[in-house]
């Protein structure tokens, strides 16, 4: 079946199977920034934005994005690069596998809250798992980024 949607503001049409997940479709079509870490919608590595809301693409049937706007890290590259600098400064990016998910979550957080509280930040990032480092470094980096990126 054909699937038509907007990928980073560009209309695309892909051939998909009805039971295919969005992460699979994106990766098959060259969007390798969408990582598949757990394949169970539990780690956040496959996070994308669908109509500006974060979703775990390894658990979302691709057909559900028909006509919608899907944003990957390529669609927020400048913001993601700035956040990556903060992660590096805090030692929060040892392997960077989780970084894409964090970048998209932080983008969504900025859209939702003008001045997020510590609890709101923690609530947003809770689904992003990192096996390399403690979450305090990510939290510190995100907090500094949000404060200075206004």
Where would I find each of the regions flagged by the language model?
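Signature of N-terminal electron-transfer/Fe-S-associated modules in redox systems
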Residues: 1-150
